[in-house]
């Protein structure tokens, strides 16, 4: 074989290797940038902000921060003697007006029986008016008593659901105002994932598609199902000025950043029992209508999936 032929073969092999490398790089780039996945995903859960409905001194806090509590379990207690005294006073008012109403009822009935032969019509009407006034006062006293009873019941703040108390920032002896958040309750078995997918990766993603969730720093893979895709996000390029006219930011036409859209993913029931707090980060891969079988994937595909954790 001549020297010229060997050069042609070497050049052909080199070009073929370069072409294969370009194709491989393009495939990897397309797989990495266009397939529906994101490293910007967060564990999320239903959180209840616990705030008292009454004001007063906190007398007891029988729970600890980050403790798992049951529904109805006492979280903290507010100054009960003060509200017990208010209820006793309200009950005394009710008893007083009940007695007064009964007395005025007898007096009005007696005057009605005697009639205008024994007294004037004006006196009869006045007696009826006094009776109606006392009845209204009794109704008001009953309402005040019921409210005092409700306030006393709400001096004991209980967990509205099973979950973990967190960010407990109240202690016995402190004064707390009505409506002031005292602790957050992370409800158990309500965890889900919010995956912020780029808009270029949303095509083909539908509710019901399966998803793989890999927590940051872990090799464990959780599974879930796409629940919904957000119907809208804030338009950061547009706002209104003081006169209501639209203000549009200037953008470079050749640089367009893809907007991220929240995709809600329900965790499978068996994966609800995990140790990852709400707010922690995860990588999410949408696998389509079925779960991906890791045993059938080629080493290159496995490497690509693993590279997502680092890129």
Swiss-Prot record:
Topology of the protein relative to the lipid bilayer: Single-pass membrane protein
Stored InterPro entries: CusB-like_dom_1 (IPR043602), CusB_D23 (IPR032317), MFP_Efflux_Pump (IPR050393), PHBA_efflux_pump_AaeA (IPR022871), RND_pump_MFP (IPR006143)
Pfam families cross-referenced by the UniProt entry: CusB_dom_1, HlyD_D23
Superkingdom of the source species: Bacteria
Gene3D superfamilies xrefs: 2.40.30.170, 2.40.50.100
Protein's name according to its UniProt entry: p-hydroxybenzoic acid efflux pump subunit AaeA
Keyword set, alphabetical order: Cell inner membrane, Cell membrane, Membrane, Transmembrane, Transmembrane helix, Transport
Family (UniProt): Belongs to the membrane fusion protein (MFP) (TC 8.A.1) family.
Molecular function per GO: transmembrane transporter activity
